[in-house]
């Protein structure tokens, strides 16, 4: 079956856009072909900095013939209805329609419309221009003669003004080939703003800029590689990672791996060449995180460390070039080294300035007094400055200083709940946001918290306070580590709860896929801390909003489900007012263990049967009594069940009060045999109305007994 090869070659595409753009191209093209009746066996997208490529295998040579029946009006319909039918069906005369008889509806017209299949070449040429013109780039531009004002022309190309092609960077050539796997392929001709699709591509911009004639995908890939272009981005990543590790190892070093940077640099080169640069060892006095970010952000280079070292860095870095230089890369290394040293010099300047005094300490005394700050210490000065400048946190939620004051009050209440030292918690809170006014964080915002910790250690803060300054931002996702120290746990909870309560108060809640303030992440962080650090916190005591509590419930469900818990078991123990998430999780754990055992499964069946019978009666308007009359218990099975319910209810309630949910489940398991015996021997719908009502009350007692730990009616299976 025929294959299709499409290449869109342009100036350099930003690395961050390449992978998604290639995926978009695949989806848009394959969807358009399938929509027009062309199926295929497989498709794969490729990308380099200068091209998007699509390889579609096993594409039908033509679309299938289609036979449609279009139902029309009755044969005795008025002329206007018949004319409308003819127009819609594309018929010239009613004699071209067929008449069908229906015993109920009478005779009516139908039109048989036969649509012959079309050659794939025709369909491809038809869909490509529209796909390219409407391509969903995040940012795009107009370029070339076609972007000139309408009415003007250049080199035979007419200006189209705003109607000209928008592409991420100037589009230079298009390859579009279709044909059998082994025979000659043909060019599918179409034109985009003077660019004619053909069979010519070009290799590496510097090493092999000449034209390459393409026949099919295999020789396209091999000829590009001869022309110093590796088409497969994942292969470029593998080459970069392998060669970088080897080069580091050869110099007695280890590569500090960075998946995000690896993805980016693989999108900056078509022919990756791995080189090593150096900088002066004096710069190693700067924190390793600043060095890594400086080199990564400004030069897209990897850092290294000594072999076997867990911390610290070496003074050598790995750079990736797109040129196989004749001098072995000496000039490239020299040029990158100059820039790296200049950037590290700036970083050292930030680092040193952040440890010095601010020039306007007199103006900070009021803020210092408000937060009990010591203006002899650099980090305290930065916190005072943050407050004095009235830096806005959110237009409706006040300044950063006001936010810290709120977190301070909340943390004061949370400290005894967590078991943290109140004085250390207070000190950690007032310094937690101070590094937002440091120059290092101003240059690299992703270092907030971490730099605060380093500056706190330098000014002699307690180890728990320093750790809390960094860790109060954690966890920042489902796999991020949690704060370990109790002081850090307290500040992290206070920070996240203040954010959530505040945004709920101003009605800035997540909607659909939109969550600009990362409130879902904050709520999940609270859930993880409470459950994984065994913190008992009644959320309604701090988040006095039922809707916010419901939001926590949703995050809890997601978290527990990811751990393997069943949704129905979570729902069975969760009530709208449940605000102790740790206890909810423990109930789910105990219920899961109980329900997977034989006693649990059988009791569940009996309890659900009782609930269904009660629901049917209550639907009829029957009012079921709250208590059971022992004198109306006539049969041994119902007497035994009532005695078992009284014992099990008392034992389960006592266990729940002691938060021993496994024992509560064990107490309920004793009901299994009496419930089974009751349904075997007892007819609930007795002829005697009083006995019947009493037996319904007994069923209600079963429901209430099991309800001490869960709502069994919500459990499936």
UniProtKB/Swiss-Prot annotation:
PROSITE patterns, sorted: AA_TRNA_LIGASE_II_GLYAB (PS50861)
Quaternary organization: Tetramer of two alpha and two beta subunits.
Enzymatic class: ligase
Any one Gene Ontology BP term: glycyl-tRNA aminoacylation
Name assigned to this protein: Glycine--tRNA ligase beta subunit
Record keywords, A-Z: Aminoacyl-tRNA synthetase, ATP-binding, Cytoplasm, Ligase, Nucleotide-binding, Protein biosynthesis
The species this protein was found in: Agrobacterium fabrum (strain C58 / ATCC 33970) (Agrobacterium tumefaciens (strain C58))
MF terms (GO), sorted A to Z: arginine-tRNA ligase activity; ATP binding; glycine-tRNA ligase activity
Family: Belongs to the class-II aminoacyl-tRNA synthetase family.
Enzyme Commission numbers on file: 6.1.1.14
One CC-aspect GO term: cytosol
PANTHER family the record matches: GLYCINE--TRNA LIGASE, CHLOROPLASTIC_MITOCHONDRIAL 2 (PTHR30075:SF2), GLYCYL-TRNA SYNTHETASE (PTHR30075)
Catalytic activity from the UniProt record: tRNA(Gly) + glycine + ATP = glycyl-tRNA(Gly) + AMP + diphosphate
Primary localization: cytoplasm
Location relative to the cell: Cytoplasm
